[in-house]
């Protein structure tokens, strides 16, 4: 019987859900798509209750992701190869580099490059945060199989494509935050969080044109805003672009990316901000692309669902639903996974089987 997988993208402003049936021979059927705004004091729990009130979403295995701004990232080099030796040593190597007690976090990692040595990109998540996420979902899902990080599943999906070896910047622009993922040679090299989102552009339009935020958001989405408002949007975008450019320079100088960015992929609800793609292209002197994962896979879906599909908003949830369950290119902080002794004496600090 085909397995039902629910990709659940929980953002600052809304919950996005894509329900997928994984069949044989790589076929996927999309059974449901929802976007529910997070409003009022009920917050995320209320939005989830509304989602799961629809019986079509019951009994699914859930794949979700922690917000990138709640995760600590570290780059570290180890003088050997091999997953077992990395797992045995990593917690000790990270201890001097973090202000968090290691018995309060889960650690997972990706190998960002490897020859005789291993370049490790590690992520540390508070155990309390992982527990909070698991508790939030446990009343509604059959199992939370994967808890990844931010837009990493979307970047990993794009890395499956044959043109993924170029030095690429994947930008997921949300309501209040942006996750930037730098990839090169088919691997995730770095993840950085920025305090910039589509809400800043909406506020700039509202203040310039002296209208309420709902009207400003509708005008922004229509894409045809008067020049004074467009100038205000550029003014709030430019500090973010400058910070992003400085991050690229730092990563290149540190040898964490092999070259300057040659490709930018822009997604997320805030990616629809008028003028953002053009200013990104001008800042980095590269073309800026959007995402549309539906066109790059074997997906079946009803016409009504297809006609309402918004790639920039829903692609992250789809990437979660299609994420491999086993060890792969993503992080996995699933709390259900048992830990074993033998990780350099720091038993349980580093979870088993980094995904």
State what each model feature region is:
Residues 1-355:
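Hydrophobic/aromatic-enriched cytosolic interaction surfaces used to assemble or bind macromolecules
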């Amino acid at each position: 019987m085909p397995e039902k997988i629910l990709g659940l993208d929980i953002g600052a402003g809304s919950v996005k859900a894509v329900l997928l049936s994984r069949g044989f021979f790589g076929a996927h059927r999309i059974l449901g798509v929802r976007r529910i705004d997070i409003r009022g004091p009920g917050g995320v729990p209320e939005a989830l209750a509304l989602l799961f009130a629809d019986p079509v979403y019951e009994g699914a295995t859930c794949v979700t992701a922690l917000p990138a701004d709640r995760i600590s990232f570290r780059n570290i080099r180890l003088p050997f190869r091999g997953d077992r030796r990395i797992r045995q040593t990593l917690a000790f190597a990270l201890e001097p580099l973090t202000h968090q007690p290691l018995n309060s976090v889960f650690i997972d990692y990706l190998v960002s490059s490897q020859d005789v040595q291993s370049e490790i990109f590690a992520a540390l998540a508070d155990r309390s945060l992982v527990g909070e996420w698991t508790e939030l979902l446990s009343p509604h899902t059959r199992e939370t199989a994967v808890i990844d990080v931010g837009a990493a599943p979307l970047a990993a999906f794009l890395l499956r494509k044959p043109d993924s070896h170029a030095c690429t910047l994947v930008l997921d622009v949300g309501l209040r935050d942006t996750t930037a993922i730098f990839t090169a040679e088919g691997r995730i090299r770095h993840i950085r969080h920025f305090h910039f989102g589509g809400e800043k552009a909406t506020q700039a339009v509202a203040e310039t044109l002296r209208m309420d935020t709902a009207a400003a958001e509708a005008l922004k989405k229509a894409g045809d805003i008067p020049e004074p408002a467009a100038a205000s949007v550029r003014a709030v975008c430019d500090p973010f672009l400058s910070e992003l450019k400085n991050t690229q320079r730092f990563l290149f100088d540190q040898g964490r990316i092999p070259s300057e960015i040659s490709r930018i992929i822009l997604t997320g609800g805030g990616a629809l901000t008028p003028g953002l793609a053009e200013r990104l292209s001008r800042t980095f002197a590269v073309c800026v692309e959007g995402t549309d994962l539906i066109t790059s896979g074997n997906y079946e879906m009803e016409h009504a669902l297809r006609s309402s599909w918004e790639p920039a908003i829903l692609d992250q949830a789809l990437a979660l639903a299609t994420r491999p369950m086993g060890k792969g290119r993503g992080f996995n902080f699933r709390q259900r996974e048992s830990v074993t002794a033998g990780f350099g004496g720091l038993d349980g600090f580093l979870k088993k089987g980094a995904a």
